[in-house]
């Protein structure tokens, strides 16, 4: 992989300057998702990167994991501040995911580890005597209208904004991107015809993400208590 430094359209081609040299191409596919910044153009105002993390427990053993998750399925809740978890493929650990919006670039911090430890204890109170061996994270691309962006403009093809469903969506959206190149036409998907919402206060929103996260947790705690 190499880092994109800049790109510009010259006649019928795009010239890309990267950390490894220059590239000249007729079509430019932008699939930056949660890592969309100013260098992709004004479209970066359509999307924001939200931190997403996964933690892996120590080896608990198949018997204990089976007791904690009897059907060995993937579980997810329906809250705004949601969690999801599942057994590892060998059924010896538990993998636990969350969106701690305050935790930009803090995979190895004690705060993130403590956060996961507390949440796993709350959701799986019978787990007892466990530790967290690994934590990794990145950014989920969330659009302001919560729909993926799939469009072609001046031979620049945008495929981004999966809102946390990238594993399921991106193979198909990648097919759509390739199809736009081979047919030299825009996608016929309904979402490609919907106007994407821009938010020019994006950078202020990023600063206030921790506050928004706290608001949703507070709101859901009240709902759980009184509804």
Predicted regions and their residues:
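A conserved short coil-to-beta-strand element within the FAD-binding core of flavoproteins
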Residues: 1-14
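Short secondary-structure boundary segments
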Residues: 2, 32, 185
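Active-site substrate-recognition segment that forms the wall
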Residues: 6, 22-154
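A generic structural signal for beta-strand entry/edge sites
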Residues: 11-15, 91-93, 156
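Residue-level detector of beta-strand face positions
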Residues: 15-17, 149
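C-terminal catalytic lobe of FAD-dependent flavoproteins
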Residues: 102-109, 114-221
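A hydrophobic C-terminal alpha-helical subdomain
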Residues: 225-227
């Amino acid at each position: 992989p190499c880092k994109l430094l800049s790109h510009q359209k010259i006649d019928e081609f795009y010239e890309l300057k990267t950390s490894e040299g220059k590239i000249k191409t007729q079509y430019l596919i932008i699939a930056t998702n949660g890592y969309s910044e100013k260098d992709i153009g004004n479209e970066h105002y359509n999307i924001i990167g939200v931190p997403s993390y996964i933690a892996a427990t120590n080896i608990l053993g198949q018997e204990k994991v089976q007791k904690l998750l009897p059907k060995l399925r993937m579980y997810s809740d329906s809250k705004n501040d949601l969690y999801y978890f599942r057994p590892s493929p060998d059924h010896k650990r538990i993998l636990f995911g969350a969106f701690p919006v305050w935790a930009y670039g803090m995979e190895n911090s004690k705060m993130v580890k403590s956060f996961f430890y507390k949440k796993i204890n709350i959701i799986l109170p019978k787990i007892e005597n466990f530790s967290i061996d690994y934590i990794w994270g990145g950014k989920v691309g969330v659009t302001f209208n919560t729909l993926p962006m799939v469009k072609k403009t001046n031979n620049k093809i945008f495929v981004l904004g999966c809102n946390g469903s990238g594993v399921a969506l991106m193979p198909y959206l990648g097919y759509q991107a390739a199809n736009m190149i081979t047919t030299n036409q825009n996608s016929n998907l309904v979402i490609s015809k919907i106007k994407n919402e821009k938010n020019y206060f994006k950078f202020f929103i990023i600063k206030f993400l921790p506050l928004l996260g706290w608001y949703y947790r507070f709101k859901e705690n009240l709902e759980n208590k009184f509804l």
